């Protein structure tokens, strides 16, 4: 899967889960399970419930995603 195939959407973090996973509600109302990308993890960016984030979704599994950006 190339970088061009991903779907980027905005969402809001609902709750933190174990192992750096989060339940995120997307703008269209869907809820997905998302993990934190490596760059966010390396830079120690904290993600809390209520934060607005950008999530990358794979076209193969739209129920899981990767958090790639946290809005200020």
Curated annotation (Swiss-Prot):
Component of the 30S ribosomal translation pre-initiation complex which assembles on the 30S ribosome in the order IF-2 and IF-3, IF-1 and N-formylmethionyl-tRNA(fMet); mRNA recruitment can occur at any time during PIC assembly. Disulfide bonds: none annotated. One of the essential components for the initiation of protein synthesis. Stabilizes the binding of IF-2 and IF-3 on the 30S subunit to which N-formylmethionyl-tRNA(fMet) subsequently binds. Helps modulate mRNA selection, yielding the 30S pre-initiation complex (PIC). Upon addition of the 50S ribosomal subunit IF-1, IF-2 and IF-3 are released leaving the mature 70S translation initiation complex. The lineage of its organism: Bacteria, Bacillati, Bacillota, Clostridia, Eubacteriales. It comes from Desulforamulus reducens (strain ATCC BAA-1160 / DSM 100696 / MI-1). The gene is infA. It is found in: Cytoplasm. GO terms for molecular function: ribosome binding; rRNA binding; translation initiation factor activity. Keywords: Cytoplasm, Initiation factor, Protein biosynthesis, RNA-binding, rRNA-binding. Belongs to the IF-1 family. This is Translation initiation factor IF-1. It comes from the Bacteria. The keyword Iron-sulfur does not apply. The keyword tRNA-binding does not apply. PANTHER family: TRANSLATION INITIATION FACTOR IF-1, CHLOROPLASTIC.
């Amino acid at each position: 899967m190339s970088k061009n195939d991903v779907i980027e959407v905005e969402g809001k973090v609902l709750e933190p889960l174990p192992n750096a996973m989060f339940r995120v509600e997307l703008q269209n109302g869907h809820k997905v399970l998302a993990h934190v990308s490596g760059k966010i993890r390396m830079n120690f960016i904290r993600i809390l419930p209520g934060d607005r984030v950008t999530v990358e979704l794979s076209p193969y599994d739209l129920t899981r995603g990767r958090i790639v950006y946290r809005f200020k």
